[in-house]
């Protein structure tokens, strides 16, 4: 259960029903939305971007951390909440309720990424569609982490009995052997 207020348009939602609603509104898989929120806010949903208590941005929420990047003058959380506080009717901003952030952020993901060809976690991070100028996330390991989280949402039976389609980019002029994984910073 959750003590978070997820009411919207006269209806009270829990997180599963909120994500189903957001998925229908955006054309984005509710599983994808759930894994993105877990990636951005943690499994227990304790991220500051959804606390509603950040000084100067009380009552604003940014479940998917859109517009959240660190600068010399502001943290990623503050920049994300600045974004959440702006007005944009298409994405239900300002995100001054949890549900407006969940639904509006999903609409943003759908319209800006999923429904225009960047329709895998990999393509959201590594933009091979535009090309190269339109990435969703800064964390290079996010696609790996999100795909692992998404896999855990399905039972072993479902995974064994469901046909999966993989979109795998093929790069030209690559070296014969793979580079070692980076370590540290």
Residue ranges and their predicted role:
Residues 1-3, 39-43, 107-114:
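Glycine-rich, acidic and aromatic/proline-enriched surface loops and short helix-turn segments
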Residues 46-54:
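Short, solvent-exposed loop/turn and secondary-structure capping segments
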Residues 11, 15, 28-29, 94-97:
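Secondary-structure capping and boundary motifs in well-ordered enzyme cores
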Residues 54-185:
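Non-catalytic cell-wall polysaccharide-engagement segments
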Residues 20-45:
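Short, functionally critical alpha-helical segments immediately adjacent to catalytic or ligand/cofactor-binding
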Residues 1-16:
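N-terminal export signals and maturation junctions of secreted/periplasmic proteins
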């Amino acid at each position: 259960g959750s003590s978070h207020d997820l009411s919207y348009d006269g209806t009270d939602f829990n997180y599963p029903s909120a994500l189903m609603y957001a998925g229908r509104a955006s054309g984005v898989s509710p599983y994808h939305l759930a894994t993105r929120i877990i990636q951005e806010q943690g499994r227990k949903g304790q991220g500051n971007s959804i606390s509603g208590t950040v000084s100067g941005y009380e009552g604003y929420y940014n479940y998917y951390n859109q517009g959240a990047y660190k600068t010399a003058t502001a943290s990623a959380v503050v920049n994300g909440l600045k974004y959440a506080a702006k007005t944009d009717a298409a994405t239900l901003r300002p995100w001054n309720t949890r549900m407006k952030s969940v639904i509006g952020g999903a609409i943003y993901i759908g319209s800006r990424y999923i429904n225009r060809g960047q329709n895998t976690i990999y393509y959201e991070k590594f933009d091979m569609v535009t090309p190269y100028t339109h990435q969703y996330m800064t964390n290079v390991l996010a696609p790996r982490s999100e795909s692992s989280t998404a896999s855990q949402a399905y039972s072993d039976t479902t995974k064994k009995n469901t046909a999966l389609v993989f979109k795998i980019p093929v790069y030209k002029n690559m070296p014969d052997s793979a580079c070692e994984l980076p370590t540290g910073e």
